[in-house]
């Protein structure tokens, strides 16, 4: 049995050839994500996972478990799977059959731990579904016009903002909430292992907390905390009930519920400086003198870098550009400037979780 990747250097060539290949890969950048989206919808990755650790299945074995009678399904699936194997999303090996044909077998590469359900039932597959959602993709077709004429691409495409639209479309509301909930769960699981700043808090408000998955995880680990999940009424109406968590509907730009501490996760990046200052001022006013705001957000490096982590935060910044009113990534210095302008005296960055930094904004500076 041979490895598919043993042959990966056969297509090598001159520097110009490599540059041309890179250009074609960039030009076709949406294809792997759309193929991955289809495989997730077909439940292919979960089928392979259920076969056991290290298992590899042939396209025929996978198709046998799909609700299809399409005679071409195996060939189509093979072509989709080998594309993702070339991106190291899947592993691939080959075996020669008795009739001389070569058959490819596919397994899950390490990155698939994020595209299949984890122990919390969370998966970045929900983010694949959201980012490749037709409504979201349509925003990119208006990016050029937004540069020339101003405005937000999503609003140009849909006639309203990405926060207004879910109220008119229950299906998209579910896709949006699912994406945010799954993403939050994955980040929060790691954050709770690294960040110790929840210790000693009596009451914690998760601002723009969605359906409450994150605050539930915090309260589950710190059961003495009274958790409050704060979000817009149309968001929390679908929120499940959690022990120790109260769902409160409201507008964070008008006021927020009083508590010892506030948690703001990947929310400031959605808004302009003006909106962020208004939100942070509401938090400041609702905190006791010894209170703090815990901000978990992506932090941009001062200059572009080529690491996967840097690419991720710049991709997120581009997503903000296309979909959110004034949304943008910020450097550490820009986050601190917002906090100081509102009146927070202390600013610390105790840790990071995946591509996000945890920042603490203290109302009064610790002595």
Swiss-Prot record:
Its EC number is 2.1.1.27. SUPFAM superfamilies: S-adenosyl-L-methionine-dependent methyltransferases (SSF53335), Winged helix' DNA-binding domain (SSF46785). This is Tyramine N-methyltransferase 1. Homodimer. It comes from the Eukaryota. One of its GO terms (biological process) is methylation. S-adenosyl-L-homocysteine binds at residues 184, 208, 231, 251, 265. The keyword DNA repair does not apply. It comes from Lophophora williamsii. GO terms for molecular function: O-methyltransferase activity; protein dimerization activity. Signal peptide: none annotated. Pathway: Aromatic compound metabolism; Alkaloid biosynthesis. Keywords: Alkaloid metabolism, Methyltransferase, S-adenosyl-L-methionine, Transferase.
